């Protein structure tokens, strides 16, 4: 049995930052995540993708953000149960909880925090009959390492931010990038759409609209895709490629958490945002993209804010007879459970007679 003060389900950026905020309050954390490494989608789906709206970072790669968070929480020695999914939760007589994972590991804590981002998720796959046989043989639904595509021919399908952004990024990596979208209009950010149009005009992206990839070809691995144009006069064309990457977004699922008796709204967990991001079950909180409330913004920076507020409430729940006096880290420094301490240099005061 793993015992901790706060059990966090989800080791994405929000869950990781919650470890830091809890550590400042001398609360120990343990994290459960179905993925084999911390970082959530930032590590699993877009580690090389730049993020522009993290305060203090004009630009930071998603993977680097995770690395920085891991370094930041290191003094607080969090525990991790990775590659296992939280399956069941049982409330104890004293109000604490036991959470059991898919591998049977039991975790006991007075506070449970669900920070699972979109929960469990899987990529939306296009209805191409032959697509399964080419998975990992030229077909991928997630770009983990852009270097795989260096000097290769790549066909990307999709009309959202991921398809646009990766087409732009790979234009400087791959030997040829083709972006196929079934409509003329894209659903992504305006500047990304304009950038794709600009790169298309100078021949760095082959933009194919009003068309779909309908079949895949190749002996032992992918070597071409069949593109069907909406304009019947253009018919179909067979395009040589080394890689086909359909980026149609993720299909989010809460998984077993949906059966825990929590109040769910549109595949998200309802919380009391006016106070502490607690759910309808006292002692269970939800922070980050997995929660919903009036005015909710699904941004990493908002998840950080929610983590800080949640930890204050968790402290009071765990220590009902204590009153925590908030101190700024610029004054108190950061004292880790490993004996380390970070603090500002003391000012030298000299009296003048």
From Swiss-Prot:
InterPro entries: FAD/NAD-bd_sf (IPR036188), FAD/NAD-binding_dom (IPR023753), Fd--NADP_Rdtase_type_2 (IPR022890), Ferredoxin-NADP_redctase_2 (IPR050097)
Family, as annotated: Belongs to the ferredoxin--NADP reductase type 2 family.
Protein source organism: Christiangramia forsetii (strain DSM 17595 / CGMCC 1.15422 / KT0803)
Cofactor(s) the protein requires to work: FAD
Signal sequence segment: none
One GO MF term: NADP binding
Enzyme class: oxidoreductase
Cofactor binding note of this UniProt entry: Binds 1 FAD per subunit.
Binding residues for FAD: 14, 33, 41, 46, 86, 121, 289, 330
SUPFAM superfamilies: FAD/NAD(P)-binding domain
Enzyme Commission number, as recorded: 1.18.1.2
Protein known as: Ferredoxin--NADP reductase 1
Keywords on record: FAD, Flavoprotein, NADP, Oxidoreductase
Pfam family, one: Pyr_redox_2
Subunit details: Homodimer.
Reaction catalysed by this enzyme: 2 reduced [2Fe-2S]-[ferredoxin] + NADP(+) + H(+) = 2 oxidized [2Fe-2S]-[ferredoxin] + NADPH
PANTHER family, sorted: THIOREDOXIN REDUCTASE 1-RELATED-RELATED (PTHR48105)
């Amino acid at each position: 049995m793993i015992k901790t003060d706060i059990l966090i389900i989800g080791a994405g950026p929000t869950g990781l930052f919650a470890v830091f905020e809890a550590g400042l309050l001398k609360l120990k954390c343990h994290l459960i995540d179905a993925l084999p490494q911390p970082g959530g989608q930032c590590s699993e789906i877009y580690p090389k993708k730049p993020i522009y709206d993290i305060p203090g970072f004009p630009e930071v790669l998603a993977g680097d953000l995770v690395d920085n968070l891991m370094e930041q929480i290191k003094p607080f020695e969090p525990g991790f149960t990775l590659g296992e999914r939280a399956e069941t939760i049982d409330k104890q007589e004293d109000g604490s909880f036991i959470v059991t994972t898919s591998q049977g590991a039991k975790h006991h804590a007075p506070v449970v925090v669900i920070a699972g981002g979109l929960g469990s998720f899987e990529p939306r796959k296009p209805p191409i009959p032959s697509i399964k046989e080419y998975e990992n043989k030229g077909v991928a639904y997630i770009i983990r390492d852009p270097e795989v595509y260096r000097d290769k021919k790549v066909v990307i399908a999709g009309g959202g931010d991921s398809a646009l952004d990766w087409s732009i990024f790979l234009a400087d990596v791959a030997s040829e990038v083709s972006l196929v979208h079934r409509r003329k209009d894209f659903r992504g950010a305006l500047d990304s759409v304009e950038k794709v149009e600009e790169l298309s005009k100078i021949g760095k992206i082959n933009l194919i609209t009003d068309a779909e990839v309908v079949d895949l070809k190749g002996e032992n691995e992918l070597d071409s895709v069949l593109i069907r144009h909406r304009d019947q006069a253009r018919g179909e064309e067979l395009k040589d490629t080394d890689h086909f990457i359909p980026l149609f977004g993720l299909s989010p699922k809460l998984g077993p958490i949906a059966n825990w008796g929590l109040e769910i709204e549109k595949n998200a967990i309802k919380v009391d945002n006016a106070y502490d991001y607690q759910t309808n079950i006292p002692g269970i909180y939800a922070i980050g993209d997995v929660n919903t409330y009036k005015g909710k913004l699904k941004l990493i920076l908002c998840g950080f804010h929610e983590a800080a507020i949640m930890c204050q409430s968790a402290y009071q729940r765990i220590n009902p007879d204590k009153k925590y006096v908030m101190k700024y880290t610029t004054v108190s420094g950061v004292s880790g459970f490993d004996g380390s301490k970070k603090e500002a240099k003391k000012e030298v005061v000299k009296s003048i007679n």
